[in-house]
Design a protein with these regions (language model features):
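Catalytic "initiation/cleavage/transfer" segments centered on a nucleophilic residue
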Residues: 1-26, 94, 98-184
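Amphipathic, alpha-helical segments enriched in basic
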Residues: 9, 63-67, 86
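Signature for HUH/AEP ssDNA processing cores
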Residues: 18-78
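A short, flexible beta-alpha/helix-coil linker loop
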Residues: 39-41, 91-96
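Short catalytic/ligand-binding loop motif for oxyanion handling, primarily in non-cytosolic enzymes
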Residues: 42-43, 82-84, 97-99
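General N-terminal targeting signals
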Residues: 51, 89-91, 103-105
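Histidine-centered divalent-metal-coordination microenvironment in nucleic-acid enzymes
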Residues: 72-94
Length: 184
């Protein structure tokens, strides 16, 4: 197996730090995982970057959805057929967010209906098919769940594959990997 690149190692360390920081802020964390994308032909690297910036900026003012968020890790990717998409991990105060599947649906619908004005798609990973990835409520003292979250989810989000390049060839930087600021 190929050794992870320094970039992947750095990203993984940052992602794990966000998880650790969130668990220090609240003894129970609601872990939400979404894949965000576009309908065929509706997305580009630049649009994805712009829409993701809107999502992050709007999160500050959209308290009905993001009020109890304490962290996030986001990876932008380009898949087959120029399919631009995002893998996102959102961390919320678990004592406030009781229904993680519903919270994932709220964020997904917000992406689809408001941010992308109907052009967006989302996949709610907080379903039974992803149970092994420790999504949903995680207790601070549950080391097995925390380690599985770091290995399976943060590890997946931090991978090097499917790198994004600007669609118009500009030098404008598109940040492929984004994390919340570690709160102390």
């Amino acid at each position: 197996m190929k050794k992870d690149s320094r970039k992947t190692q750095r990203r993984h360390k940052q992602g794990c730090a966000v998880i650790d920081s969130s668990l220090k802020l609240d003894s129970r964390v609601a872990v939400i995982r979404l894949d965000l994308s576009y309908q065929d032909g509706k997305g580009s690297a630049d649009r994805l970057n712009s829409d993701l910036n809107k999502l992050r900026l709007n999160a500050r003012s959209k308290s009905s959805i993001f009020k109890d968020q304490i962290g996030y890790v986001i990876k932008l990717e380009k898949g087959n057929n120029d399919n631009y998409h995002v893998h996102a991990l959102f961390l919320f105060r678990g004592h406030e967010v009781k229904n993680h599947k519903y919270k994932a649906e709220q964020i997904g619908r917000y992406w689809q209906e408001i941010i992308t004005k109907g052009d967006g798609l989302y996949h709610n990973c907080n379903t039974k098919e992803y149970d092994k990835n420790c999504l949903g409520a995680i207790e601070r003292n549950d080391e097995d769940a925390t380690n599985a979250l770091k290995k399976n989810v943060a590890g997946y989000l931090c991978k090097d594959k499917q790198s994004i390049k600007n669609s118009n060839g500009s030098d404008k930087k598109i940040r492929e990997f984004r994390c919340s600021v570690i709160k102390k």
